[in-house]
C-alpha cells in the first residue's frame, strides 16, 4: 500500500483489500500485479491441493493458523499469534490501555479475555464474554 501514490487507487485498494477488483472477477486494477493468487497468503504460493491433503498436522485446518514452509521445503502450521507477533503485541498493548479506560464491567471483562485470545489464538472465552455483554455502547469486532 505504501507504494501506491494515487490517492484514489490507494483508497480503492483499501476497499478491495488488495490490488484486485472483486467486482470485476478479481482482475488487477494496478499495474505490476498479475492474477490474484488462490491461496491469499494463508498458504505457500506453490502449494498443491495434494500436498496440503498429505500434510499431516492437526492444526492445518484451524481458523487461526497459516501454512508456511520449513527451510527444507516441508510444510508447517504457524499460529497467528506467532506469525503476526509484532502486530499482535501492538494490538494487545492498545487493548490493555482500553481496559484501563473501560467503565463497563462487561466490556472490561471482554477486553481482558480478548487480549488473552490474541496471545493464544483461543477465542472461545472472549467470544462468550462478548455475547454476555448487555449494556456496552462499544461494538468491537
Predicted regions and their residues:
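Acidic/polar surface patches and capping/hinge elements
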Residues: 103, 107, 113-114, 118, ...
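N-terminal helix-rich structural modules
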Residues: 1-114
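Generic structural signal for short, flexible, solvent-exposed coil/loop and linker residues
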Residues: 96, 129-131
Amino acid at each position: 500500500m505504501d507504494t501506491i501514490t494515487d490517492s484514489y487507487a490507494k483508497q480503492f485498494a483499501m476497499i478491495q483489500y488488495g490490488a484486485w477488483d472483486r467486482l470485476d472477477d478479481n482482475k488487477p486494477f494496478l499495474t505490476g500485479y498479475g492474477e490474484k493468487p488462490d491461496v491469499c497468503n494463508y498458504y505457500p504460493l506453490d502449494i498443491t491441493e495434494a500436498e496440503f491433503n498429505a500434510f499431516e498436522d492437526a492444526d492445518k485446518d484451524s481458523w487461526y493458523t497459516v501454512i508456511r514452509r520449513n527451510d527444507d521445503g516441508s510444510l508447517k502450521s504457524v499460529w497467528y499469534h506467532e506469525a503476526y507477533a509484532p502486530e499482535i503485541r501492538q494490538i494487545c498493548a492498545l487493548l490493555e490501555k482500553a481496559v484501563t479506560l473501560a467503565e463497563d464491567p462487561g466490556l472490561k471483562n471482554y477486553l481482558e479475555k480478548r487480549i488473552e485470545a490474541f496471545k493464544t489464538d483461543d477465542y472461545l472465552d472472549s467470544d462468550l464474554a462478548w455475547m454476555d455483554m448487555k449494556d456496552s455502547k462499544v461494538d468491537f469486532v
